[in-house]
């Protein structure tokens, strides 16, 4: 009888305890290869619940409540120092991170909400002096993404900077972190570009930047195309590998069939909007000679 009572109390405790963030994903830089990085990005994509597939591309859910809205990435540098990164699974946006017993969150409403569910045991919480969009981060970093190296060595440096929180270089480190995780999950091209640089860095191309700037637009038009005979309602202009503008008008384009790996739910696009980066402004005003 006592054993049954103990078992019942154990089961009750499991079901009534506070919900926790699940679906954690880990990546270690020590011994990392192109393959292990690819597995990490694959695991990240699989940690994001989706509503259905559109043209065989997972369409992220429009809304998830409570702790289920977030997953954690545990990233370890060459020196065996780990940061944990909180990601909103509905849009792959990074909310903040934990280093030791200190949590750091972006200065925005969505990150404030995330702090109610992640890193609650941190002894200290720091609100960063900027939000998580590209425009704000580039302003804080004093440079645009094209001038910030990527690659696994760059990710190692970013983790180290964030682990010790070097304020003067944190924004640049966060830009590296976002592109090495969220953007790689969104696009196979970006995953491949970063993953093949195991022991060296590179500067992202304008093609990479244009993909990052247009994830919302592509997601929206791909969803429209699924009920419009494969045609986009409005073209999405990207930059190709030759730094030329290309107009994407339908779901048969290669960026749809073999590149984009996740779709932002169109119910969230109006609320989130497209990040307006310095680079995009440069495109519009011809500052890059395109």
Curated annotation (Swiss-Prot):
Residues 271-290 form a propeptide. Glycans are attached at residues 214, 250. It catalyses: Endohydrolysis of the N-glycosidic bond at one specific adenosine on the 28S rRNA. Residues 1-23 form the signal peptide. GO terms for biological process: defense response; negative regulation of translation. Keywords: Glycoprotein, Hydrolase, Plant defense, Protein synthesis inhibitor, Signal, Toxin. Ribosome-inactivating protein of type 1, inhibits protein synthesis in animal cells. Its EC number is 3.2.2.22. Coiled coil: none annotated. Especially useful as immunotoxin for pharmacological applications as it has low toxicity in rats and mice but is potent once inside target cells. It comes from Bryonia dioica (Red bryony). Appears to undergo proteolytic cleavage in the C-terminal to produce a shorter protein. Belongs to the ribosome-inactivating protein family. Type 1 RIP subfamily. One of its GO terms (molecular function) is toxin activity. Changing residue 212 to K: 10-fold reduction in activity. This is Ribosome-inactivating protein bryodin I. PANTHER family: PTHR33453, RIBOSOME-INACTIVATING PROTEIN. InterPro entries: Ribosome-inact_prot_sf (IPR036041), Ribosome_inactivat_1/2 (IPR017989), Ribosome_inactivat_prot (IPR001574), Ribosome_inactivat_prot_CS (IPR017988), Ribosome_inactivat_prot_sub1 (IPR016138), Ribosome_inactivat_prot_sub2 (IPR016139). The active site is at residues 183, 212.
């Amino acid at each position: 009888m006592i054993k049954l009572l103990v078992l019942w109390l154990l089961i009750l405790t499991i079901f009534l305890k506070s919900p926790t963030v699940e679906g954690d994903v880990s990546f270690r830089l020590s011994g990392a290869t192109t393959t292990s990085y690819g597995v990490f990005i694959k695991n990240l994509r699989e940690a994001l619940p989706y509503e259905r597939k559109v043209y065989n591309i997972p369409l992220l859910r429009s809304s998830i409540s409570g702790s289920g809205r977030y997953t954690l990435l545990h990233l370890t540098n060459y020196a065996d120092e780990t940061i944990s990164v909180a990601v909103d699974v509905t849009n792959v946006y990074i909310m903040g991170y934990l280093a030791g017993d200190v949590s750091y969150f972006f200065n925005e409403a969505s990150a404030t909400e995330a702090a109610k569910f992640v890193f609650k045991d941190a002894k200290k919480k720091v609100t960063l002096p900027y939000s998580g969009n590209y425009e704000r981060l580039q302003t804080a970093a004093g440079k645009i993404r094209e001038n910030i190296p990527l690659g696994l060595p760059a990710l190692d440096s970013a983790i180290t900077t964030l682990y010790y929180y070097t304020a003067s270089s944190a924004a640049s480190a966060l830009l590296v972190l976002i592109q090495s995780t969220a953007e790689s999950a969104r696009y196979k091209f970006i995953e491949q570009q970063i993953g093949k640089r195991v022991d060296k860095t590179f500067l992202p191309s304008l093609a990479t930047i244009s993909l990052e700037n247009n994830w919302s637009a592509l997601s929206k038009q791909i969803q429209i195309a699924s009920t419009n005979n494969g045609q986009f309602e409005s073209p999405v202009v990207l930059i190709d590998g030759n730094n030329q503008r290309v107009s994407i008008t339908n779901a048969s384009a290669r960026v749809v069939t073999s590149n984009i790996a996740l779709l932002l739910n169109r119910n969230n696009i109006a609320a989130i909007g497209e990040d307006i980066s310095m680079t995009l402004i440069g495109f519009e005003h011809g500052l890059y000679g395109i």
